[in-house]
UniProtKB/Swiss-Prot annotation:
The gene is bagdpd. Disulfide bonds: none annotated. This is Glycerophosphodiester phosphodiesterase. Its EC number is 3.1.4.46. It comes from Bacillus altitudinis. The lineage of its organism: Bacteria, Bacillati, Bacillota, Bacilli, Bacillales. It holds the Pfam family GDPD.
């Protein structure tokens, strides 16, 4: 059965990558969440997508140039302020504390280190995975495929996934070079086909496209038999999956 991941929490209805979004994702019927981590100036794992604070907070500048205590003073509610009030950028440990309350709930941690390298981010994520004992239900993804190769050396038993905005020719072969098990392509690309899904499955690999939001996209991906989807509207995807059973 195709797993449904709540993209950045419940991004369609709540401020992305915030505790309120993750709380609602937890009760949406989704099988897991996806979140993004970056390192603050003082080496904390902040959960935020953009390298710049401007789009999703009332602050300006780069995440890496602020300590976490400074970031906490900002408001990350952006366009949802009237519904949620002010909310803060959470730490990875806060999110893991929440979601580990539900057994089997999956967590996709995306390392946002393709623009700024954030040396040591792999080791810090490893520490959190071990602390919360979620090795059996976590996957780590990144657009920085060299970072995934490093993570494999640190935790060879953890599932890794290659993120890409472009089409990768023979992704089943490419994944083996890292090595990674998961292929996470952009739904807007031309790389999600029956042939690609079959080739990956033949090598015991998995495919989880992003970001799958419309009813048509969701139905198409479920019909293709992809292993998972990332969606801003997990409740919608869960409903469609139930209807298609």
């Amino acid at each position: 059965m195709t797993k449904i991941f709540a993209h950045r929490g419940f991004k369609g209805n709540y401020p992305e990558n915030t505790m309120i979004a993750f709380e609602h994702a937890l009760h949406s019927g989704a099988d897991g969440i996806e979140l993004d981590v970056q390192l603050t100036k003082d080496g904390r794992l902040a959960v935020i997508h953009d390298e710049k604070l401007n789009r999703t907070t009332n602050m300006k500048g780069l995440v890496k140039d602020y300590t976490y205590e400074e970031l906490k003073r900002g408001d990350a509610s952006h366009s949802f302020y009237e519904e949620t009030g002010a909310v803060t950028i959470p730490l990875l440990e806060e999110v893991l504390e929440l979601v580990t309350q539900r057994s089997s709930f999956m967590i996709n941690i995306e390392l946002k280190n393709s623009i700024y390298r954030y040396p040591g981010i792999e080791e810090k994520v490893k520490e959190q995975i071990e602390h919360f004992q979620i090795e059996d239900r976590v996957l780590v993804s990144s657009f920085h495929h060299g970072s995934l190769a490093l993570f494999h050396k640190l935790m060879p038993h953890i599932e890794l996934a290659v993120l890409t905005m472009d089409v990768i020719h023979q992704p089943d072969m490419y994944l083996k070079t890292i090595p990674a098990k998961g292929y996470h392509p952009n739904i807007k690309g031309a790389g999600v086909t029956k042939e690609v899904v079959s080739a990956l499955h033949a090598d015991q690999q998995v495919i989880r496209p992003f970001t799958v939001n419309s009813e048509k996209q969701i139905k198409n991906m479920l019909t293709l038999g992809v292993d998972g989807i990332f969606t801003d509207f997990p409740d919608r995807a869960v409903k469609i999956r139930e209807e298609m059973k």
